[in-house]
Amino acid sequence: MEKQKLSVKNSITDYIEWLAQYGASADGGVTRLLYTKEWMDAQLAVKTEMSSFGLETRFDDVGNVFGRLSGTQSPDEVIVTGSHIDTVINGGKYDGAYGVLAAMLALKQLKETYGAPKKTLEAVSLCEEEGSRFPMTYWGSGNMTGVFSEQDAKEPRDESGVSLQTAMHESGFGKGVFQSAYRTDISAFVELHIEQGKTLEMSGRDLGIVTSIAGQRRYLVTLEGECNHAGTTSMKWRKDPLAASSRIIHELLLRSDELPDELRLTCGKITAEPNVANVIPGRVQFSIDIRHQHQHVLEQFHQDMVALINGICLQKGIRAVIDEYMRIEPVPMDERLKAAAFETALENGFSCEEMVSGAGHDAQMIGRRYPACMLFVPSRGGVSHSPKEYTSARQLEIGVRALTDLLYKLAY
């Protein structure tokens, strides 16, 4: 089928504003937490809009919404595109929502311009990615890929004590045949997303082609020393866990800077007990988050970090407990899909560059099971998870155009 020149017929910015009404806050932010009324209203609105585009729509058993354009030659070979509908508390309008709406608009325009594809296309509005209501992330893509089961919904609870399973049932989901095995019909997944960083804005390029999504490890480090008087305890006799933690964090940041490929290290949470100005703390806890695109780098840094913490604490007479509570492996994006994305960008005259995603995305979960790729558009100031999150209309439209043409290349 001969490819025609496509334009964005429906304003992506209008759709961004439309979806942002569901869970809108007074300062321009959006809060759409899994299985709340705002979330349910948004998913139903998306499903209705997909149907108006002529797509076959359905909910799966956890609340993911699919809009299907069946293929004529290989209907069982499905190319899925989309992102997540949920937000962080008082987040922005674009994170996740942009990828959902772009997927819908791309399928609408392809259908109107070319009719049915050879391979099946599906737009998906994934129910959850952020982990903002329950202490579990990727509930939507994790179910689609068979990583999670209904058993996994029983324990996680929100701040009100409501379990994930209860909230799911109260929203009308989780009562049918639960997706217990991964889908075998998906041949590719494409996710369009805002960058949530400032690399593209600084380089002036239109698109980022993601090469891999960084692996993550998170730790809670507990240091126990000796609580004592701030005025009467000599510096040389102290067993101060806060002083030890300061030295540990400083040394880890220095070491992360020395690596040739950037390792991102964050210590974003720290508590001291009893947290009194004139008392040497007896106990300190702090978090460590490390991210890198190569598994061997993460593993080596982990080993070096454990040795450093134990070494400093041994010198100071402090007991250390290191609890690794999250481990997500790096996921490379599919080479064939990346090449097709680059080709599409060049054909349209869009400037682009390869990027590693330091943030986790649904493509990371899905990319473990199926070929996947991600496209980024610029984020102004690199701001995200905030009401100030913003991407210009031109940049949004470039992303939709690139996605539409890439799907044409893959499915028609």
UniProtKB/Swiss-Prot annotation:
Query: Which cellular component appears as one GO term in the record?
Result: cytoplasm
| Cofactor binding annotation | Binds 2 Zn(2+) ions per subunit.
UniProt: Zn(2+) 1 binding residues: H84, D95, H193
Per the record, the domain of life is Bacteria
Indicate whether Mitochondrion appears among the record's keywords: no
Q: Which residues bind Zn(2+) 2?
A: D95, E130, H385
Q: Which Pfam families match?
A: Peptidase_M20
Describe what upregulates or represses it.
Transcriptionally regulated by PucR. Expression is very low in excess nitrogen (glutamate plus ammonia) and is induced during limiting-nitrogen conditions (glutamate). Expression is further induced when allantoin is added during limiting-nitrogen conditions.
User: Could you tell me the EC number(s) of this protein?
Assistant: 3.5.3.9
Identify which cofactors the protein needs according to its UniProt entry: Zn(2+)
The places in or outside the cell where this protein is found are: Cytoplasm
Q: Which CDD domains match?
A: M20_bAS
Protein keywords: Cytoplasm, Hydrolase, Metal-binding, Purine metabolism, Zinc
Gene Ontology molecular function, alphabetical: allantoate deiminase activity; zinc ion binding
Query: At which positions is allantoate bound?
Result: R218, N278, R291
Q: Which family does it belong to?
A: Belongs to the peptidase M20 family.
PANTHER family hit by this protein: ALLANTOATE AMIDOHYDROLASE (PTHR32494:SF5), ALLANTOATE DEIMINASE-RELATED (PTHR32494)
Q: What exactly does this protein do?
A: Involved in the anaerobic nitrogen utilization via the assimilation of allantoin. Catalyzes specifically the hydrolysis of allantoate to yield CO2, NH3 and S-ureidoglycine, which is unstable and readily undergoes a second deamination by S-ureidoglycine aminohydrolase AllE to yield S-ureidoglycolate and NH3.
Q: What is this protein called?
A: Allantoate amidohydrolase
**Organismal lineage:** Bacteria, Bacillati, Bacillota, Bacilli, Bacillales
This chain is encoded by the gene named: pucF
